[in-house]
Amino acid sequence: MDKLNICFVSLTFAPDAQDGAAKFFTGIYNYFKNQGHNVKVITGKWNKEILDPDILQIEIIRRRFFWFPQFNLHTIKYLMKNEFDIIHGNSPKGVLPIILANKKQFISTIHDLGPFETTFTRIPIEKLLIKYAVNKSTYITTCSEFIRREIKYYIPKVAINKIFNLYSAIEDKYKPLPKEAQKLKEELNIRGPILLYIGRIAKYKGVSDIIKAYQIAKKEIPELNLVMGGKPDFYMENTYQEWKQKYKDIYFAGFISEKEIPAYYSMGDIFVTYSYASEGFGLTPIEAIACGTPVICSSMVAYREVLKDHAILVPPRKPKQLAEEIINLLKNDSKRQMLIEKAQEFVKRYTWDEVGKKLEVLYQKFINNK
């Protein structure tokens, strides 16, 4: 295809942020740059500076909703001054400034429909923003067939033929690192098997159920450790600080850098992720599997679609059942090894080349129909 001028608008972007949406846009940014396209990114600055002249990081107030005026005003101004062949927004928060800049044709990515699926979202504007972004988008991409169908279910007026599933992908750096894992374990002064969670500390992530399951499993396996990586969201900040005081036997790692994450995955004997809502793909379990760590996760539709039989699936909000699966897997070395070996070929399908090629087809379709 001809070389394109592309602009990605994404509130978060890796390695400054570690959420799946941020990693997705970093992955496609790298792919299209490597293909020789002129690609720009507009994003917020949350944790660290990204030293790339093609990535514009906007200084924002790092609190819920306080980022809104700064990010939107700077993005609108930038989009009104510059012309692009493709403008692609990451989630409704990335799409809104595109619409406000009066850009009539653009592509959006919807990763999940959390505000429709959960009861903890008390602000109806989040649902309205998703509907607004979906209805205004020329085309929409998702990371699973489940989310593609969910968009049509919750927003019936949208044409299903403008929604495209790309899945997601992982980087080559996610591979077993036994030496680095052992060194990390020694640095953290951890002895015994490790139950690992890496992700946002959010209510819908089922983190409290993971802690309950760990406490149950620890009665059967006293040497068991729980390592939790990730930062709390706005709603969970106070609870997270209380946990750190209450659970002295749990290692709360906080924000883990991109460079360190593969070693953490490799250090775990089991990776657990236990969301009960708002998951469109499930990137962290794929990364963990690639690092040679077996996975236990909730039996949400997106996880069943993406992981299939390459993880142990447990119904959400059942910490006792989760604990039983943790105990059984830790006591069954052959089953752990079987899960690891069986999944190695499976994870190879999730590459940025595969995602990028699908997106190239959609971009060409977009250009042809402008």
Provide a role label for each language-model segment.
Residues 89-94, 110:
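Short His-centered aromatic/hydrophobic patch
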Residues 134, 255-256, 263-268, 283:
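Short alpha-helical donor nucleotide-sugar binding micro-motif in glycosyltransferases
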Residues 238-259:
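Nucleotide-activated donor-binding/catalytic signature segment of Leloir-type glycosyltransferases, i.e.
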Residues 294-297:
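Short hydrophobic beta-strand element within catalytic cores of glycosyltransferases
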Residues 312-319, 328-334:
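Conserved acidic donor-binding segment of nucleotide-sugar-dependent glycosyltransferases
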